[in-house]
Amino acid sequence: MINDRETLDLVPLSLPPGAPAVAWQVSDALVPYPEAIAAMEARAAAIAAGQAPELVWLLEHPPLYTSGTSGKDGDLLIPRFPLYASGRGGQVTYHGPGQRVAYVMLDLKRRRPDVRAYVAALEQWIIGTLAHFNVRGERREDRVGVWVARPDKGAGFEDKIAAIGVRLRRWVSFHGIAINVEPDLTHFSAIVPCGVTDPRFGVTSLVDLGLPVTLQDVDVALRQAFEQVFGPTADAGLPADDAALLR
């Protein structure tokens, strides 16, 4: 069943014309998870205090697992890589090279203080990004994230191509989304991804779907689709201390 979040009005998630653009930062090197968390928390606090602009930060992590606030002990089947308690919503997932993570730090008090509408907007952003590659991403009522139908695997089979996990502090968001471009999908076999145990529902990536897509291709699509949902962006001009953290 299609998720009723699809019916939410997304227009209020963008700011009025003339509002400051969202800073857009891309890290080329792998970013350790603890470093990313520290940078996000510092930036979110600065945004809440009116001392920094909103930010979208694109990066890759080294191979690791993270557990959200709904994670269960049994979700990690094989401790192949480090497991971090993330504080975001959701359960256990994998991050690693070939997966584009986008950490999103927006002031929802100014945009729309509505968590449900924000998650719907993130889903729409992902769906718009996938559409650039002629991939139909879909919401599901009982499963978070964005899914693609896999009729090649059988009737009713679907694979998750993008994950969502968010946290808010003083109505500033952090954490965000992860789109599988070309990660090693075998690493998902060491966990119960996002708590989904039904064998009809797996994990896929753009390359797994047969598309010769690079991270750089996805970055372009992400930025265009983001602006359609949330409004204008601008290349981040970070202070020296922030640049050290954000690569």
Swiss-Prot record:
Keywords: Acyltransferase, Cytoplasm, Transferase. It comes from Rhodopseudomonas palustris (strain BisB18). It is found in: Cytoplasm. One of its GO terms (biological process) is protein modification process. The active site is at residue 194. Belongs to the LipB family. Substrate binds at residues 88-95, 163-165, 176-178. It holds the Pfam family LplA-B_cat. It catalyses: octanoyl-[ACP] + L-lysyl-[protein] = N(6)-octanoyl-L-lysyl-[protein] + holo-[ACP] + H(+). Its main location: cytoplasm. This is Octanoyltransferase. In the reaction, the free carboxyl group of octanoic acid is attached via an amide linkage to the epsilon-amino group of a specific lysine residue of lipoyl domains of lipoate-dependent enzymes. CDD domains: LipB (cd16444). Residues 50-234 form the BPL/LPL catalytic domain.
